[in-house]
Amino acid sequence: MSIKSDKWIRRMSEEFGMIDPFEPNQIKEADGKRIISYGTSSYGYDIRCANEFKIFTNINSTIVDPKNFDPKNFVTVEDDCCIIPPNSFALARTVEYFRIPRNVLTVCLGKSTYARCGIIVNVTPFEPEWEGYVTLEFSNTTPLPAKIYAGEGVAQVLFFESDEICKTSYKDRNGKYMGQTGVTLPKA
């Protein structure tokens, strides 16, 4: 299994729609202002956060149960940024829609710009033949409110191509997060 380069990422996105919309360059400025970079890097792709957020709230005093998740645990926000309360959590989704080839697995790592501020971005691997918008998880580990910017980079996706095709892909087993179109809450 080997990591794939910018040339491969560009070809797979332009010819097969692996990433849509696809940015072939590394974008570091918008409207003359510095932003948190996104787009193609040497051996990965920096994904952006869309303007759709779900922020944890305790107004209903429920228990967080991944097998029986109550959507009332979140407040939905659509804005160009999201303020995550201290020691709290938010979900978002990517701007980009992904179509992962059958012989590819991705690993996604949060950008250091956010990590250095105590904001942890978690994304599970994109499995072979998974497709959809990626649900992003943000943890604010600080005692202060933390800001996430929509339309800017939040994490880097690394693509690994296997030497052989898997017997059963995510699509084959009807994965529960297949084809997600928005911020998707836990499913058991």
UniProtKB/Swiss-Prot annotation:
- Check the record and name the SUPFAM superfamilies matching this protein: dUTPase-like (SSF51283)
Extract the GO molecular function terms from the UniProt entry. Answer: dCTP deaminase activity; nucleotide binding
* Database matches in NCBIfam families: dCTP_deam (TIGR02274)
Pathway recorded for this protein = Pyrimidine metabolism; dUMP biosynthesis; dUMP from dCTP (dUTP route): step 1/2
Q: Subunit info?
A: Homotrimer.
Q: Output this protein's name.
A: dCTP deaminase
* Residues that bind dCTP: 111-116, 135-137, 156, 170, 180
- E.C. no: 3.5.4.13
Q: What does this protein do?
A: Catalyzes the deamination of dCTP to dUTP.
Native organism is Neisseria meningitidis serogroup C / serotype 2a (strain ATCC 700532 / DSM 15464 / FAM18)
Q: Which reaction does it catalyse?
A: dCTP + H2O + H(+) = dUTP + NH4(+)
One GO biological-process annotation of the entry reads: dUMP biosynthetic process
